């Protein structure tokens, strides 16, 4: 009976939501596969992303040529797109010298121990050199466009935080900084510099490849669209991976993203009320939210991904439960209505997985699950775009920055941020009590829409740093007009003192927050308390947000403060979710 009710609810969602603006093109649903068409993997989406000129390196089946795979799907009425990896892929001809007569396995990402980080056999994660980018453009992008494909998806621009020791990375360091490479484990400064370079290398890679794709397509009379399928900033930060993320939205050659959120990313444990555990629904909600807020002010297209299984082998009951959790989370963003309905249907429909957690017996997908899954996918095919809002006390936003990824590994001076607790410490206390907390990207504050729906902004510099000073002007202006800022932080993590704009070129601030506070007429290091600025309010709490979730009951004072600021200062209404009198004094 529960399953029946779940399916009926989906049908109501698909047909009953008021329709707002429509999507800009006719691709609403898509999926990725390295296989040719066959009935068992035909899921009736609008488009298919045919994976890899040489296929998917993890797929060991006999592969048809790229052109034959394209033809097989096109004959069945599918719109054809292309997907491949930008950091890894079926590129053995490059690594083994078939491209230019030179071996390039030394261009893999390497750890301090001297080990290459592999995605698979002969498939290293790449330090994207100019030579590799030339190879991608000539051997892959040209061939795809020549086959008539006018949409290219370059997925997962990923540089592992624990990497940064290869000769190829050292060469890129010298070119970028003008001085010799420095080991990232030796100081926070070196870690920060290393992360900024990793960030830049994949920004450059996507910019070059996509710009080439558009220019080459134009020479063929084609308007080529370019997209970045990427994990969320939440997940990359937690998994200790550096990626360009929000900065890509500023590139004119990037037309949109796929939010790669699924059970595998969302089951990463986090802390709440002193307990570390999986919280798949809550994490998925925040992951999708960070992707939505990353592109919302820019107007770029966004596909939301869900996966009925995951990369790690588990059992069908586990897959189904967590698929439903992530699927539900994506529907809580009604302003997004384009979807990648699944990756790799060949492994979903044809793979063998355990029948239960306590059994070694393996079977293909149960009929009841495949039927439910197809109903869910068909609902997405008809899901309208809407400007509907969630119920609940809206107006809380957590500030994020790409530099969240810069402070994750290695750690220094004994400062730890376990499981990204400084982020979750601001979000989970509210979310777990039914408050639909959102995220805002500091890189987007220049867009007036970025803070338009925010009543109370939650921020810290314990886990990130502002890469540009302009963000502080935008925050100060927003507060002056009536916004409420709650700043939580001791400002004593080891990255406060890295050489950056706040302590160079005429600036002499000991912390980035000192510059922010100065914009609002406060001293460089104000005491904990409540301050007025213009029509708005600044609350400073001298506690790192991780302490709100690492300890049982650690969020009590934070919740009372958030409720009081929301109700009394922001005048945003009653925060019913907290459920207690929210009068509390800051001392």
Where are these regions (language model features)?
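Bacterial Sec-dependent N-terminal signal peptides
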Residues: 1-23
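Aromatic-lined carbohydrate-recognition surfaces of secreted/lumenal glycan-active proteins
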Residues: 25-33, 81-85, 153-157, 192-241, ...
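Catalytic domains of carbohydrate-active enzymes, especially glycoside hydrolases
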Residues: 26-68, 72, 142-152, 252-257, ...
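Hydrophobic targeting/anchoring helices
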Residues: 41-46, 51-52, 155, 217, ...
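Glycine-rich, aromatic-flanked loop segments that form ligand/cofactor-binding clefts
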Residues: 65-119, 150-161, 213, 217-228
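Active-site-adjacent "subsite" loops/lids of carbohydrate-active enzymes
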Residues: 82-147, 181-199, 207
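A glycine-rich, often tryptophan-bearing local segment used as a flexible ligand/cofactor-contacting loop or short
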Residues: 99-100, 466-545, 550
């Amino acid at each position: 009976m529960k399953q029946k009710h779940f399916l009926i609810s989906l049908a109501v969602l698909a047909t009953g939501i008021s329709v707002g603006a429509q999507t800009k093109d006719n691709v609403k649903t898509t999926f990725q596969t390295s296989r040719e068409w066959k009935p068992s993997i035909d899921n009736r989406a609008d488009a298919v992303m045919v994976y890899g000129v040489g296929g998917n390196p993890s797929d060991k089946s006999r592969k048809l040529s790229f052109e034959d795979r394209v033809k097989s799907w096109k004959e069945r009425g599918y719109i054809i797109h292309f997907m491949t990896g930008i950091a890894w892929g079926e590129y053995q001809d490059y690594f083994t010298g078939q491209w230019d007569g030179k071996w390039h396995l030394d261009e893999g990402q390497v750890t301090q121990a001297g080990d290459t980080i592999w995605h698979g056999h002969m498939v290293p994660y790449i330090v994207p050199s100019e030579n590799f980018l030339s190879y991608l453009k000539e051997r892959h992008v040209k061939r795809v466009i020549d086959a008539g494909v006018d949409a290219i998806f370059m997925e997962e621009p990923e540089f592992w935080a624990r990497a940064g020791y290869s000769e190829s990375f050292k060469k890129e360091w010298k070119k970028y900084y003008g001085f010799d490479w420095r080991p990232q484990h030796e100081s926070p400064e070196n870690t920060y510099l290393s992360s900024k370079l990793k960030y830049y290398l994949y920004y450059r890679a996507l910019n070059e490849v996509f710009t080439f794709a558009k220019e080459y397509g134009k020479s063929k009379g084609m308007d080529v669209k370019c997209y970045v399928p990427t994990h969320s900033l939440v997940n990359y930060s937690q998994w200790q991976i550096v990626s360009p993320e929000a900065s890509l939205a500023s590139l004119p050659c990037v037309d949109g993203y796929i939010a790669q959120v699924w059970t595998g990313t969302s089951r990463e444990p986090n802390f709440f009320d002193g307990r570390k555990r999986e919280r798949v629904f809550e994490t998925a909600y925040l992951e999708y939210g960070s992707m939505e807020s990353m592109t919302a002010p820019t107007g770029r297209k966004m596909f939301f991904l869900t996966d009925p299984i995951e990369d790690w082998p588990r059992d069908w009951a586990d897959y189904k439960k967590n698929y439903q959790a992530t699927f539900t989370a994506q529907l809580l963003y009604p302003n997004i209505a384009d979807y990648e309905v699944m990756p790799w249907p060949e492994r979903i429909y044809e793979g063998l997985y355990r029948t239960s957690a306590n059994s070694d017996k393996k079977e293909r997908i149960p009929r009841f699950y495949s039927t439910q899954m197809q109903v869910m996918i068909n609902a997405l095919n008809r899901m309208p775009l809407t400007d509907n809002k969630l119920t609940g006390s809206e107006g809380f936003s957590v500030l994020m920055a790409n530099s969240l990824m810069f402070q994750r590994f290695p750690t220094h001076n004994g400062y730890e941020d376990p499981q990204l607790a400084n982020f979750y410490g601001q979000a989970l206390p509210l979310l777990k009590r039914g408050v639909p907390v959102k995220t805002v990207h500091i890189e987007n504050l220049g867009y007036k829409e970025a803070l338009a729906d925010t009543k109370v902004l939650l921020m810290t510099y314990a886990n990130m740093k502002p890469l540009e000073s302009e963000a502080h002007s935008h925050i100060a202006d927003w507060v002056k007009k009536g916004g409420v800022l709650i700043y939580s932080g001791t400002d004593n993590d080891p990255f406060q003192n890295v050489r950056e704009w706040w302590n160079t070129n005429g600036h002499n601030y000991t912390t980035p927050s000192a510059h922010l506070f100065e914009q609002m007429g406060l001293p460089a290091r104000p005491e904990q308390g409540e301050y007025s600025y213009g029509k708005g309010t600044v609350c400073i709490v001298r506690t790192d947000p991780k302490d709100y979730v690492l300890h049982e009951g650690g969020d009590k004072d934070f919740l009372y403060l958030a409720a009081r600021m929301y109700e009394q200062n922001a005048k945003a209404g009653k925060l019913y979710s907290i459920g207690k009198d929210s009068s509390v004094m800051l001392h």
